[in-house]
């Protein structure tokens, strides 16, 4: 078996990626989230496949087909709630994974980092089109509001929106194409994930100390396979608890009402994992400015390798930047809270302050703290 996995053309690739892969001996549980994201993707593809067998992408029957899945299909309710809450688990793991990358300076592996940003954007696009499919009130109005933002693009905006809608409003054509996108995008995510791994294994993994670990590496299996299995079991425990005991806690009550173009919900808002970006969008009174800020709130992650001037790797020995990092995390939580609140005082003011803080920390405070710490080292 050992000879086979080392010499077989296909097994050799698996062997170099998951069995004999030289891994730093000191990586902590924060490094588990990569494998958890892989697990989440598998769960989402499998549950999504079974849901697609019973779902109909037609405005007249989409809502009732979801109700049919929950009521008449064997364990349909479980598959549906695993898929819906699986998306939330996916984004929790995704945000922790990105947060760990920032904290431990993994962005210096620029190819891996940039593919990761593409993965984040693709996952967000997949989640957005997926949220439209149940064709509830928030699905319909969320799709209308978010796609309508493209009309802010000069010259081609209005044409682009009508092209995406497939008409003059969100309707049957929109739902059909969103279903097609939602079906194909997870497989594109899987392909990007393989490229992400390919780039990671070219350079080797980062580690908590931020030091070169070439002299102290251990095989991935059995040490980290067992460690990852523990993480997977804990993830499944949380996911099953959510799906079985609190299935609708992360959803929106408006989505229990079929889509009605004549009745606008009091507060249109996306799923919780988009609220931070939605808060940034709403903080700018100008439509085009808001759209640019929304896009930049994600794309600014690509600036981390460019703005990095520190002589140390990661934040473990950098108390000044560490403090700024935790302020940044707290600020993100404030933005998430504000995104779910109505557009009125004091929420708008808090949102504007938090949005300015978000960009200020990344563009100004972190590079300045890097310079301060570099000068402290020289003393």
Curated annotation (Swiss-Prot):
Family: Belongs to the cytochrome b family.
Species of origin: Akodon lindberghi (Lindbergh's grass mouse)
Transmembrane segments: 33-53, 77-98, 113-133, 178-198, 226-246, 288-308, 320-340, 347-367
Main location: mitochondrion
Name of the protein: Cytochrome b
Annotated positions binding heme b b566: 97, 196
Location(s), subcellular: Mitochondrion inner membrane
Quaternary data: The cytochrome bc1 complex contains 11 subunits: 3 respiratory subunits (MT-CYB, CYC1 and UQCRFS1), 2 core proteins (UQCRC1 and UQCRC2) and 6 low-molecular weight proteins (UQCRH/QCR6, UQCRB/QCR7, UQCRQ/QCR8, UQCR10/QCR9, UQCR11/QCR10 and a cleavage product of UQCRFS1). This cytochrome bc1 complex then forms a dimer.
Positions with a binding annotation for heme b b562: 83, 182
Topology with respect to the bilayer: Multi-pass membrane protein
Molecular function in Gene Ontology: metal ion binding; ubiquinol-cytochrome-c reductase activity
Keyword list, A-Z: Electron transport, Heme, Iron, Membrane, Metal-binding, Mitochondrion, Mitochondrion inner membrane, Respiratory chain, Transmembrane, Transmembrane helix, Transport, Ubiquinone
């Amino acid at each position: 078996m050992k000879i086979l996995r080392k010499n077989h053309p296909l097994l050799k690739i698996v062997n170099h990626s998951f069995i004999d892969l030289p891994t730093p001996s000191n990586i902590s549980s924060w490094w588990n989230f990569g494998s958890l994201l892989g697990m989440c993707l598998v769960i989402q593809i499998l549950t999504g496949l079974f849901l697609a067998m019973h779902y109909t992408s037609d405005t007249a029957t989409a809502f009732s087909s979801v109700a049919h899945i929950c009521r008449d299909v064997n364990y349909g309710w479980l598959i549906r709630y695993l898929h819906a809450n699986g998306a939330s688990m996916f984004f929790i793991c995704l945000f922790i994974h990105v947060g760990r990358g920032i904290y431990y300076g993994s962005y210096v592996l620029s190819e891996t980092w940039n593919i990761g940003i593409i993965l984040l954007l693709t996952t967000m696009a997949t989640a957005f089109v997926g949220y439209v499919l149940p064709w509830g009130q928030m699905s319909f109005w969320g799709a209308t509001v978010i796609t309508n933002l493209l009309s802010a693009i000069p010259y081609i905006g209005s044409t682009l929106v009508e092209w995406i809608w497939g008409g003059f409003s969100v309707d049957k054509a929109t739902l059909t194409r969103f279903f097609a996108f939602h079906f194909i995008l997870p497989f594109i995510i899987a392909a990007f994930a393989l490229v992400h791994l390919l780039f990671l294994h070219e350079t080797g993994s980062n580690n908590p100390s931020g030091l070169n670990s070439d002299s102290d590496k251990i095989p991935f299996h059995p040490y980290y396979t067992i460690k990852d299995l523990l993480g997977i079991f804990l993830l499944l425990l949380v996911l099953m608890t959510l799906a079985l005991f609190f299935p609708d806690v992360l959803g929106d009550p408006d989505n229990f009402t079929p889509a009605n173009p004549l009745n606008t919900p009091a507060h249109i808002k996306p799923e919780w994992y988009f609220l931070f970006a939605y808060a940034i969008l709403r903080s700018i009174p100008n439509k085009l400015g808001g759209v640019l800020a929304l896009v930049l709130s994600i794309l600014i992650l690509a600036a981390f390798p460019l703005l990095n001037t520190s002589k140390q790797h990661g934040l473990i020995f950098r108390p000044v930047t560490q403090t700024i990092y935790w302020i940044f995390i707290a600020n993100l939580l404030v933005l998430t809270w504000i995104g779910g609140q109505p557009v009125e005082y004091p929420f708008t003011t808090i949102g504007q302050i938090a949005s300015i803080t978000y960009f200020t920390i990344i563009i100004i405070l972190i590079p300045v703290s890097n310079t301060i710490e570099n000068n402290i080292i020289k003393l």
